[in-house]
Each structure stands twice: as C-alpha cells, then as structure tokens.
Amino acid sequence: MRVRNKPWAPKLIAAHPELITEDPTQLKGRWQSRFAKPQPLQIEVGSGKGQFIIEMAKRHPEINYVAIEIQTSVIAIILKKLVEAPLPNLQLAHADGQAVTAFFEPHEVDRLYLNFSDPWPKSRHEKRRLTYKSFLSSYREVLKPNGQIEFKTDNRGLFEFSLTSMNNFGMQFEQVWLDLHAVATPEDNVETEYEQKFSAAGPIYKIIATFPAK
C-alpha cells in the first residue's frame, strides 16, 4: 500500500513507545509483556492502514494482536487511530514482516494473517511472494503446532500460486473461498481498506490453512 508521505509520522512514532516498537527483535519471546494480560497471540504481516487488525482487536478482546508494517507513513496512520482510541490488546511493529523468525520465538504465535500481499506477478519474482515456501517455513516456525494462516487476495494468480505452494508444503486446507463476498456476511468477514474499495471489481479469494504438527 502506497500513501503520501506523512511528515508528522516519525515524531508520532517516537512519542509512543508503549504502543509501537521499531525493533521487534527486542521483544522476541516476551510479546505478552506488552499487553494488559497474557492471551493467545495473532499477527498480521503487512497491516496497511489497520482497518482489519483494529476491527479484529475490537471484536476479540480475548486475543492479543500484533500489526506488522514496514512503511513509516502507513503504520503511523494505525498508531494515530490507537492514540485516539486505545486498544489494550493491539501492539504495532514498524518492521519488515518477512523477518518473523527474528521477531517471535518458535510457537509464540497462534495465527497469522496475510491480507492482499503484493502478488509479485513476474515469475522471476516468485520468491518474494509471501506464500513462497521459504516464508511458509518461517511461519511454521513461529506458529504453534497446528497453527493457521488466513490469506486473502483479489489476485487470481497469487491465489493459485498460494494454493499450490501450501499444498506442496503439506498444509491442510480448512476452508477455501473462490468468491468470499458471495457467501460471507459482514459479520463473518472483517474487511481491509483495500478489500472494501475494490471488492466490487472482482472476486476475493480466501484460504484458511493449517500447518501439520511436526
């Protein structure tokens, strides 16, 4: 997600270390200390402006969430929302979500969300896709046994690639949607900003898949 530069972003981030970390490696294995109380931990890699993760935190106070976003101006938008309306079960990480094994101990995470990741459509870039086997290996390491990935995209090519990649990795498909909005009600589906804006243009694909226990 590209947004205009927010000159105020670095100052806001620096002013709220209680809500956002710029070095999540320092919290590896002790993320629960950042929350009001220990609870199951779920993370979103690439959180955009935060509509999805904020709504999830509101709906599920019994779960702790970490939103990971690399773009300064984008994560500052999430932070601004949190400053205005605090959520004790949501923390932010200003970092590259591709490095999850540097941020979380093995089996520290219960569920991982990938929403509308960059499809990297050229075949020579397939290793950059967040459902490539090397990323799946990292996710399996930080997720608890039988941990789940929830994946959404509007890109048919990325959807098909992800199905194949997950299947080759030995993952079990719990549910697969070829047109999520044709069957899901607003109560069942928490939308991202991108999804809300572009879902009318074509189908939204979704996968819920589980890693087999080692």
Swiss-Prot record:
- Please tell me where S-adenosyl-L-methionine binds in this chain: 44, 69, 96, 118
Task: Copy the pathway line from the protein's UniProt record.
Answer: tRNA modification; N(7)-methylguanine-tRNA biosynthesis
CDD domains noted in UniProt = AdoMet_MTases
Q: Tell me which UniProt keywords the record has, alphabetically.
A: Methyltransferase, S-adenosyl-L-methionine, Transferase, tRNA processing
Q: Name one GO molecular function term.
A: tRNA (guanine(46)-N7)-methyltransferase activity
Q: PROSITE patterns from the xrefs?
A: SAM_MT_TRMB (PS51625)
One Gene Ontology term, aspect cellular component? tRNA methyltransferase complex
**Per the record, what are the reactions this protein catalyses?**
guanosine(46) in tRNA + S-adenosyl-L-methionine = N(7)-methylguanosine(46) in tRNA + S-adenosyl-L-homocysteine
Keyword Protease included in the entry's annotation: no
In short, the EC number is: 2.1.1.33
The active site lies at 118
The residues listed in the UniProt record as binding substrate, with positions renumbered to this chain, are: 122, 154, 192-195
Annotated region (Interaction with RNA), positions in chain: 124-129
Give the matching InterPro entries.
SAM-dependent_MTases_sf, tRNA_(Gua-N-7)_MeTrfase_Trmb, tRNA_methyltr_TrmB_bact
* Database matches in NCBIfam families: PRK00121.2-2, tRNA (guanosine(46)-N7)-methyltransferase TrmB
Q: Which HAMAP family match?
A: tRNA_methyltr_TrmB (MF_01057)
Query: What's its job?
Result: Catalyzes the formation of N(7)-methylguanine at position 46 (m7G46) in tRNA.
Q: Which family does it belong to?
A: Belongs to the class I-like SAM-binding methyltransferase superfamily. TrmB family.
Q: What is this protein called?
A: tRNA (guanine-N(7)-)-methyltransferase
| Protein species of origin | Lactiplantibacillus plantarum (strain ATCC BAA-793 / NCIMB 8826 / WCFS1)
Q: What is the lineage of its organism?
A: Bacteria, Bacillati, Bacillota, Bacilli, Lactobacillales
